[in-house]
């Protein structure tokens, strides 16, 4: 998949040697996947509520790597929800515990 970052600060954090090994592995998993559906590890799941339209994978404890689709045209199912199996471009928007 094509992976971008919401801002330079987030990109630099993800690419730094001080970032966790699990974060780097999850990013590598995203890049190696053809679509969101191909992600196997990290308990991948679509989000709800104020994060509707975003997807997350687990890192450490309650921390998550959160991303959203950026395909030129966001693929949708008949019910209007995002068809994550067809999402091939994502933007990393948040890393941390969104449960707070």
Where are these regions (language model features)?
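Amphipathic alpha-helical interface surfaces
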Residues: 6, 23-26, 43, 59, ...
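Enriched for short, Lys/Arg-rich terminal
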Residues: 57-100
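Arg/Lys-rich, positively charged N-terminal/basic patches that mediate binding to nucleic acids
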Residues: 1-28
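Residues in well-ordered beta-strands of folded domains
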Residues: 31, 48, 91-93
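A short, surface-exposed loop/turn module that caps and links secondary-structure elements
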Residues: 33-55
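Short, contiguous, well-ordered secondary-structure segments
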Residues: 26-27, 32, 75-77
């Amino acid at each position: 998949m094509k992976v971008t970052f919401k801002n330079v600060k987030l990109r630099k954090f993800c690419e730094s040697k001080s970032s966790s090994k699990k974060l780097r592995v999850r990013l590598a998993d995203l890049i190696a996947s053809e679509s969101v559906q191909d992600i196997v590890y990290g308990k991948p799941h679509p989000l709800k509520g104020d994060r509707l339209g975003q997807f997350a994978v687990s890192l450490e404890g309650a921390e998550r790597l959160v991303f959203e689709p950026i395909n030129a045209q966001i693929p949708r199912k008949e019910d209007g929800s995002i068809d994550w199996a067809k999402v091939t471009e994502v933007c990393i928007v948040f890393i941390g515990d969104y449960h707070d």
